[in-house]
Curated annotation (Swiss-Prot):
Protein name per the record: Protein phosphatase 1 regulatory subunit 42
Main location: cytoplasm
Free-text function comment from the UniProt entry: May regulate phosphatase activity of protein phosphatase 1 (PP1) complexes.
Origin: domain of life: Eukaryota
Biased composition (Polar residues): 318-329
Organism: Danio rerio
Gene coding for it: ppp1r42
């Protein structure tokens, strides 16, 4: 097992020969950048002497657990992509961390980020997920990042919705290509809350094939500069925004007119019910509705008496059930 230790740093590090007056311990205390990428490292040992470390490169290794970083209170950049990490943990003391790279691991839930009050970039693309599973997001972690996170990469994670990310209102860049996003209305709702969004990559998602997909997102994301790798022309954006505003303005009066007509009909029906069918105003309105127009032929009125058959087969006139029928000819 290859472990990252101070001895390995001494062996492979760049302790300058010209600094012979400086001890190795002093060198470690002053160290700010440490690059041990692609060294087959499986575990991080105690590096607490490197108290001023700000950038740590550990990508392309065999690390299975994030550990022993509690000393690195000054760390701002952590690169641990392409390892065997399955859980985001032990990062609570990294209060200055602004960029975290964890792509290409085996993480199933984005969690354990509640104490990262300075995190601006999070990269968790291309996780090695079990068949049929998608990357999930812990609400507490997402809520804690709502005022700081600007750049998020969640591409290639079988994600089919973005509701959980709605609180991230400081977002400027979202990379979510090669997922299973399909609901254009959901995306419009989420992105309408991200007023600072400048770059959006949803390429190779099912939603890209929806009618007017590009037009709808450009309209709702009013400051978007780049969509799916294509620049957005300012004139085109303004045209789409104006077109939507005009369409909405025309729709409102029609909706209002329909609503007024519906209310009037309801009031008329209600009034007739309370007045009763024999009220003069009701009879007048009823007769006006049945009156033929000038272009119609006058009706011929027939009186028919309901014939009631007696037990002998003969008909008797029922005066009490006299009906009137009108026939147009």
């Amino acid at each position: 097992m290859v472990r990252l230790t101070v001895h390995l740093i001494a062996k492979l590090g760049s302790h300058s020969k010209s600094s012979r007056s400086e001890s190795f311990q002093q060198y470690l205390r002053k160290l700010t950048h440490l690059n041990f990428s692609d060294k087959n490292i499986e575990e991080i040992d105690d590096l607490s002497v490197c108290r001023n470390l700000t950038v740590l490169y550990l990508y392309d290794n065999q690390i299975s657990q994030i550990c022993n970083l509690g000393f690195a209170s000054n760390l701002t950049h952590l690169y641990m992509q392409n390892n065997n990490i399955s859980c985001i943990e032990n990062l609570s003391s990294l209060h200055k961390l602004s960029k975290l790279f964890l792509g290409g691991n085996s993480i199933t839930v984005v969690e354990g980020l509640e104490e990262l009050k300075s995190l601006k970039e999070l990269h968790v693309e291309g996780q090695k997920l079990p068949c049929g599973e998608k990357l999930a997001f812990d609400p507490h972690s997402i809520s804690s990042l709502s005022e700081t996170l600007c750049i998020l990469n969640i591409s290639k994670n079988n994600i089919d919705e973005l509701w959980d990310l709605a609180p991230l209102r400081k977002m400027t860049h979202l990379f979510a290509a090669d997922n299973q996003l399909h609901d254009i209305q959901e995306l419009e709702t989420v992105f309408s809350q991200w007023f600072k969004l400048r770059l959006l990559d949803l390429s190779r998602n099912p939603v890209c094939h929806k009618p007017k997909y590009r037009d709808r997102l450009i309209t709702v994301c009013k400051f978007l500069d780049d969509l799916d790798g294509k620049q957005i022309n300012e004139l085109s954006r303004q045209f789409l925004i104006n077109w939507k505003a005009s369409k909405d303005a025309k729709k409102k009066p029609e909706d209002g007119k329909d609503n007024k007509l519906q209310v009037a009909n309801q009031l008329s029906t209600s009034a007739d019910f309370h007045l009763g069918p024999q009220h003069p105003s009701v009879r007048e309105r009823s007769s006006s509705l049945s009156k033929p127009s000038e272009n119609e032929k006058p009706g011929v009125t027939f009186r028919t008496d309901q014939i009631q058959a007696d037990s002998r087969g003969r008909g008797t006139r029922g005066d009490s059930s006299t009906e009137w029928q009108s026939l147009k000819i």
